[in-house]
């Protein structure tokens, strides 16, 4: 059911009859006027390349009560009485949800954080965006597969493994990802200090020497801070690392051994570390109702031979590049670039296939993993939720797939890009253990939310759902291509522009209906009462399916958030000035109850799609 589509179709028919133009052409150019006094639907005549001075008389219809030509626009006014009858004659519980006529099998890969320390606020946006678009696509009728890429064969995991072995493989303590994160940060900072001290022994120019001294001072300060958190671990690791003649050689041994899978002991230790960290991730993400269908291990790609297969194909068309092999991407045809969503005129750098020692790079593994995602799920589309800093590597990936003969995959691989998350007054570095973890964020938001709930004598049993809504709204309300500044004190506001505000508004609508004792019959409604904010709410309810499905199809949850917020604002303004259950006029009361019913459905289905739980009490 899509009431506003019915309105638009009738308007198109009226205008088509008046101007002698195809209804389909008109439909595509319709707009909503910036001010309600201008009309409810608008057609800009210049978009049809018509003479704007042409005088035409338009008729009206069942849903359209008046059509006016104002300047270069033809504006229509909806008959609110007929719209009310159309809307509430057919409204079902799933109002707004329209299953797509073209269902697809879609893989959404998101989060995919290195399993070396807890998830932090930098991962938060990725996780929430990935989970939300997965939810929205499922509601639309697509078959969605959520995947997490486990980067267990990289240098950072090798550094953590070295530290854990040097400590004697102690039993982890809760919360396990925080515990391993500390070991990783300590190990890494000790190695960096040692390497920097060696560099300072070289003959350096004054500026370079000064920069390295400043960097050393920063690392030493970080080391002191880390030592305060666990002096025993720090001192033991410092002694062990500084007694190793060549630390880099030890790290490379772990990397190469694990890549080959030929040392059962290394294999067992790395998998233990990685899987325990993933348990920590799952525990954190569960607080936000986020989960995955599949965890794909990078090591499995290597051991299965998939990466070697890709390399074998790539070497056939690769060129020599700085002592190794690379795919030349600079001169790709502009038509192919357009197909692959690569900006015109952009010269992509070569995609290097291997290190100088012949071992594969993450770029080559990404090609193999993309093939796996498509083949495992028989996917029509794969969506990679990855930060905007990875735009060039993602373009290289699509271009490389195309050159290697995977044209369909390249054309259906989507980079869902997003800007970074900034935490006011905090500079983050995962390597140095300087970050706000996802658990810290949830805890801090919980503290603020709990205080506000208690101030209102609210229901504390809903705390987890309120925290989830506050965090999700803060992330989703900003367009993905813009940065988010995360202010914990501002995201829990029951009065305006927040997840809890939308939940509070839903609870208000729900409880009006729950307390009602009247039988709500359409024939009893007073349609003359559809004025002011009630008319505005009626139009918003009618527009919900269009906004809802467009936001899903365009992967723009921020548009749905904005619509729900505007709807909640109008509803609360109306309810603060006009009673519903206390209205003595029975027919007016019925009309208002229908409006509340529509708002309750809009908020319920909209919030549910965003992963925000609609609450019946706050």
Swiss-Prot record:
It comes from Sulfolobus acidocaldarius (strain ATCC 33909 / DSM 639 / JCM 8929 / NBRC 15157 / NCIMB 11770). A motif ('HIGH' region) lies at residues 113-123. Belongs to the class-I aminoacyl-tRNA synthetase family. GO terms for cellular component: cytoplasm. Its EC number is 6.1.1.19. This is Arginine--tRNA ligase. The gene is argS. It catalyses: tRNA(Arg) + L-arginine + ATP = L-arginyl-tRNA(Arg) + AMP + diphosphate. Its main location: cytoplasm. It is an enzyme of class 6 (ligase). It is found in: Cytoplasm. Keywords: Aminoacyl-tRNA synthetase, ATP-binding, Cytoplasm, Ligase, Nucleotide-binding, Protein biosynthesis. InterPro entries: Arg-tRNA-ligase, Arg-tRNA-synth_N_sf, ArgRS_core, DALR_anticod-bd, Rossmann-like_a/b/a_fold, tRNAsynth_Ia_anticodon-bd. It comes from the Archaea. One of its GO terms (molecular function) is ATP binding. GO terms for biological process: arginyl-tRNA aminoacylation.
């Amino acid at each position: 059911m899509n009431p506003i589509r019915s309105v638009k179709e009738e308007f198109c028919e009226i205008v088509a009859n008046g101007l002698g133009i195809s209804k389909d052409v008109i439909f595509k150019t319709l707009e909503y006027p910036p001010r309600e006094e201008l009309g409810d639907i608008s057609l800009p005549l210049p978009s049809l390349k018509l003479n704007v001075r042409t005088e035409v008389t338009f008729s009206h219809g069942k849903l359209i009560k008046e059509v006016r030509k104002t300047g270069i626009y033809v504006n229509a006014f909806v008959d609110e009485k007929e719209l009310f009858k159309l809307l509430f004659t057919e409204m079902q519980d799933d109002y707004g949800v329209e299953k797509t006529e073209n269902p697809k099998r879609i893989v959404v890969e998101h989060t995919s954080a290195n399993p070396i320390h807890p998830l932090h606020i930098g991962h938060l946006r990725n996780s929430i965006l990935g989970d939300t678009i997965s939810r929205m696509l499922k509601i639309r009728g697509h078959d969605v597969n959520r995947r997490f890429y486990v980067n267990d064969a990289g240098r950072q995991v090798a550094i953590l493994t070295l530290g854990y072995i040097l400590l004697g493989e102690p039993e982890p303590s809760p919360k396990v990802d925080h515990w391993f994160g500390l070991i990783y940060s300590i190990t890494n900072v000790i190695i960096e200090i040692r390497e920097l001290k060696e560099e300072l022994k070289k003959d350096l120019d004054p500026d370079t020497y000064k920069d390295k001294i400043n960097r050393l001072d920063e690392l030493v300060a970080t080391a002191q801070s880390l030592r305060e958190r666990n002096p025993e671990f720090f001192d033991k690791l410092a002694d062990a690392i500084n007694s190793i003649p060549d630390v880099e050689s030890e790290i490379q041994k772990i990397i190469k051994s694990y890549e080959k899978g030929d040392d059962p002991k290394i294999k067992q230790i790395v998998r233990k570390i990685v899987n325990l960290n993933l348990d920590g991730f799952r525990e954190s993400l569960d607080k936000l109702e986020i989960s995955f269908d599949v965890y794909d291990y990078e090591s499995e790609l290597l051991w299965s031979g998939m990466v070697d297969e890709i390399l074998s194909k790539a070497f056939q068309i690769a060129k020599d590049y700085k002592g190794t092999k690379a795919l030349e991407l600079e001169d790709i045809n502009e038509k192919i670039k357009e197909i692959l969503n690569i900006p015109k005129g952009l010269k992509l750098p070569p995609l290097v296939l291997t290190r100088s020692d012949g071992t594969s790079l993450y770029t080559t593994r990404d090609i193999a993993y993309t093939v796996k995602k498509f083949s495992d799920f028989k996917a029509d589309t794969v969506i990679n939720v990855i930060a905007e800093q990875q735009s060039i590597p993602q373009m290289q990936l699509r271009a490389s797939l195309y050159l290697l003969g995977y044209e369909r995959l390249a054309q259906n691989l989507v980079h869902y890009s997003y800007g970074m998350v900034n935490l006011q007054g905090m500079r983050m570095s995962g390597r140095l253990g300087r970050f706000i973890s996802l658990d810290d964020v949830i805890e801090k938001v919980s503290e603020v939310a709990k205080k506000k709930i208690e101030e209102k004598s609210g229901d504390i049993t809903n705390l987890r759902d309120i925290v989830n809504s506050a965090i999700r709204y803060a992330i989703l309300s900003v367009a993905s291509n813009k940065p988010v500044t995360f202010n914990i004190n501002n995201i829990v506001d029951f009065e305006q522009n927040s997840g809890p505000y939308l939940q509070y508004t839903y609870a208000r609508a729900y409880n009006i209906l729950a307390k009602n004792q009247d039988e709500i019959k359409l024939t009893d409604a007073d349609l003359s009462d559809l004025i002011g904010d009630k008319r505005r709410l009626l139009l918003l309810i009618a527009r919900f399916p269009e906004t809802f499905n467009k936001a899903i199809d365009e992967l723009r949850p921020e548009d749905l958030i904005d619509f729900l917020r505007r709807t909640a604002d109008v509803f609360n303004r109306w309810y603060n000035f006009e009673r519903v259950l206390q209205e003595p006029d029975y027919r007016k009361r019925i009309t208002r109850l229908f409006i509340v019913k529509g708002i309750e459905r809009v908020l319920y289905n909209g919030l549910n799609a965003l992963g925000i739980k609609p609450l019946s009490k706050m």
